[in-house]
From Swiss-Prot:
SUPFAM superfamilies: YgfB-like
InterPro entries noted in UniProt: YgfB-like, YgfB-like_sf
Pfam families referenced in this protein's UniProt entry, alphabetically: UPF0149
Stated family: Belongs to the UPF0149 family.
HAMAP family xref list: UPF0149 (MF_00346)
GO cellular component: cytosol
PANTHER family: UPF0149 PROTEIN YGFB
The protein's name: UPF0149 protein Xfasm12_0965
Residue ranges crossing the lipid bilayer per the database entry: none
């Protein structure tokens, strides 16, 4: 049996999304969900309808891939060992596809975060800076970069790690508060 904190595979998320008639990619869905949860929003079965802005969308069935995606994401965000991971492109994807998935994930994260945190007016200085950084990534495209596989692969991994930690910091800001001391080590 899979660990409750293990994210489903990208292909499984996309297949189930298509079966449900959803026009959303796995990175977009996970980014929106992560933003919603990081901002302290929707702790229940209506999460999918909320992030898709469609009240007609049914909640994912119990035990489904999308329900497991929700459970794993929520568990990872709460994990004291900072287990949160981004659901991006498959491992075999090209650098350009991976970068595009990351930019798409960031766009979706900001949308989900905005849904949850719209009433919160105060973030820490770090939280404000993180949102600005994520907005820059959300506006980026692979056309903005020289996609040299050898040189850029490590850089993309560093950006992915920055985004991962940034989400945890924003989650702490929203659920613990901007004035509480936060330590990641």
């Amino acid at each position: 049996m899979e660990s409750p904190m293990h994210l489903p595979e990208v292909i499984a998320v996309e297949q189930e999304s298509q079966q449900m008639g959803l026009s959303v990619t796995a990175p977009e869905l996970h980014g929106s969900l992560s933003g919603l949860l990081a901002g302290g929003g929707c702790n229940g079965p209506d999460w999918l309808a909320m992030i898709l802005a469609d009240a007609e969308v049914a909640a994912p069935p119990k035990g489904s891939v999308l329900e497991r995606l929700y459970q794993a994401t929520a568990s990872q965000l709460e994990d004291p060992d900072f287990a949160f991971q981004l659901l991006l492109a498959d491992d075999g994807a090209t650098l350009a596809a991976r970068a595009d998935a990351l930019f798409e994930w960031c766009r979706a994260f900001l949308g989900g975060f905005g849904l949850a945190a719209h009433s919160r007016s105060v973030l820490s200085a770090e939280g404000d800076e993180i949102l600005r950084d994520l907005a820059k990534l959300a506006q980026a495209s692979v056309d903005d970069f020289d996609m040299n596989e050898d040189k850029e692969d490590g850089s993309l991994e560093e950006i992915e790690e920055y985004v991962r930690v940034a989400v945890l910091l924003l989650h702490g800001d929203c659920l613990i508060g901007p004035c509480a001391p936060q330590r990641l080590n």
